[in-house]
C-alpha cells in the first residue's frame, strides 16, 4: 500500500478521525507532494530531507498565508512522518523539529446577550425550516457543541429523560452535555413536526437530527449558510462564523459564574489552557464596559 493510502487508513480506522479531518490531512500531503514535483522533482517521501522542508516553508511564507494555515500544514506533515517512522518506512521525521514563531492569539469573537436575543427573534416562525433553525440555534448556543458535532448529531444521542446529549467529539472522545428547557422545547417541536415534514421529501431514511430542506443530513457548511442568512435579518454587523455561538456559550457561562473546569468539560477541550482564552474575553469585555460607563470617561 502506498504511504498516503496507508496513512489515510490509519487516520480513518485507528484514529477514527472525521471525514473532514482526514480530507484536510490528505490535502496538505498532496499539496506538499505537488510542490516537490514542481521544484526539482518528486521520487519518494523517503527521500525528503531538511533542505526540502526549509524550501517548502519559505514558499509557504511567501504565499502570505495565515500562520494558523501554515501551522496546520506542518502539523499534518509531522503526523504523516511520525506514522512513517512508526511503520519503519523512514528512519527520521524531517518535520519533527520544525517550529514556527509564536502566534499572537486573537480573542474569540462572541455575541453579546442582547445580540443573541435579536438573533433568536429571526426564528420565531412556525414553518418546518423555522422550527429547525430555532432548534439549531438553541442547541448550538445552549450547549456550546461544535458545528461539526451538531451536524453529526443523531436521534439516539438525544435523551430527553436526562436532558443530555451524547457528543462524539474530537479524537473519538465522547462526552455528555446537558441541554436546558429552551433547547428541549425547541427540539421536541422540531422533531415532532418540522423534521417529519422535511423528511417526507427524502426517500433516504436516516437518524440525523438536523436536515436540510430536502430531508437530507445537513452539513457543517450548510449550518454556516443558515447562520449567514439569519444574520442578514438582524442589525448585527459582525463578521459571523459558525463557532461564534460556541464562543458566546463559553463567554456567557463564565460571565455568570461558571467554573472554568466545568466549561472545559462542556466544550470538550483536552487542555484547560484552551478554555482559559475565554477568561481573557470576559476580562476584555469588563474593561470595555468600564471604559464605556465609568463617569470619569463619559
From Swiss-Prot:
Which Gene3D superfamilies does the record match to this protein?
1.10.150.130, Intergrase catalytic core
Which InterPro entries would you find in this protein's record?
CB, DNA_brk_join_enz, Integrase-like_cat_sf, Integrase_catalytic, Integrase_recombinase_N, Integrase_SAM-like_N, Recomb_XerC, Tyrosine_recombinase_XerC/XerD
Q: How does it assemble?
A: Forms a cyclic heterotetrameric complex composed of two molecules of XerC and two molecules of XerD.
Record family assignment: Belongs to the 'phage' integrase family. XerC subfamily.
Location within or outside the cell? Cytoplasm
Q: What's a GO biological-process term for it?
A: DNA transposition
Residue ranges occupied by any Core-binding (CB) domain in the UniProt entry: 1-85
**What's the protein called, per UniProt?**
Tyrosine recombinase XerC
CC terms in the record's Gene Ontology section: cytoplasm
